[in-house]
């Protein structure tokens, strides 16, 4: 967190110099793709479509790599141990085997639910409602995570100057929300505590924050009315080490 050489956030931000080197149409599409309104279709794609695409491409990759392995072994007079190959195969689309299994099981459950609910209320009605609900909920959660790292004064270091603790404390906002929203989001507003130690469960984040208030003076509170200004910060100035809008 806070090392913008390694990770450019959920919006994959570019540097200010890279943005300046783009032509006018590329700049326009860069800004358009990071406009808050696109959180809704983008959220639906990220939550519903992207994992299924990754699963499909991962399956195709497994078949292609496996076929190449089988034919290579046959040329050398060997038989491929397929269970071992499948178990040891490292997909380009997933980090772990468990992630593959979870996505596959989730997709099968979703297909069953889609079919059942579509038959129950009509497929057109179902998909309209499903898109509205899922795109809205995904947009809200992506926005919450975005503003917890993209905010005025956020710690935006490069690799050589990066500090783990500054990244956690100064690179994570303390989103000020009503208690009911904190409950719905499982206290993720205490994001700085999460980045200090990912092993702390969500139901302990608030207690850890209160127990260490004297060490958290540099945590930046962020209020709901300030959220719109965060969406303007879509460039990383890798010289001044700060997030800036496209107009600068």
Enumerate the predicted regions with their spans.
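Hydrophobic alpha-helical transmembrane segments
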Residues: 28, 104, 127-132
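Hydrophobic core of alpha-helical transmembrane segments in multi-pass integral membrane proteins
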Residues: 102-118
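A cytosolic-side transmembrane-helix exit/cap motif
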Residues: 146-154
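Long, charge-dense tracts
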Residues: 245-246
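Membrane-embedded catalytic scaffold of the fatty acid hydroxylase/desaturase
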Residues: 1-103, 153-242
């Amino acid at each position: 967190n806070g090392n913008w050489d390694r990770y450019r956030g959920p919006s994959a931000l570019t540097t200010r110099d890279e943005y300046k080197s783009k032509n006018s149409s590329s700049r326009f599409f860069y800004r358009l793709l990071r406009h808050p309104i696109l959180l809704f279709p983008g959220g639906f794609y990220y939550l519903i479509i992207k994992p299924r695409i990754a699963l499909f491409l991962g399956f195709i990759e497994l078949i292609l790599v496996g076929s190449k392995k089988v034919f290579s072994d046959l040329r050398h007079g060997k038989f491929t141990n397929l269970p071992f190959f499948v178990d040891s195969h490292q997909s380009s689309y997933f980090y772990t085997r468990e992630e593959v299994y979870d996505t596959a099981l989730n997709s099968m459950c979703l297909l069953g639910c889609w079919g059942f609910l579509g038959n129950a209320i009509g497929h057109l009605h179902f998909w309209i409602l499903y898109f509205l609900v899922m795109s809205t909920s995904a947009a809200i959660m992506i926005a919450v995570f975005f503003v917890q790292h993209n905010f005025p004064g956020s710690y935006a270091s490069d690799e050589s100057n990066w500090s783990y603790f500054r990244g956690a404390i100064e690179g994570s906002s303390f989103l000020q929300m009503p208690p009911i929203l904190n409950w719905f989001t499982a206290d993720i507003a205490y994001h700085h505590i999460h980045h200090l130690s990912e092993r702390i469960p969500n139901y302990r984040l608030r207690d850890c924050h209160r127990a260490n208030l004297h060490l958290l003076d540099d945590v930046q509170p962020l209020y709901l009315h300030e959220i719109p200004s965060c969406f303007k910060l879509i460039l990383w100035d890798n010289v001044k080490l700060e997030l800036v809008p496209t107009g600068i």
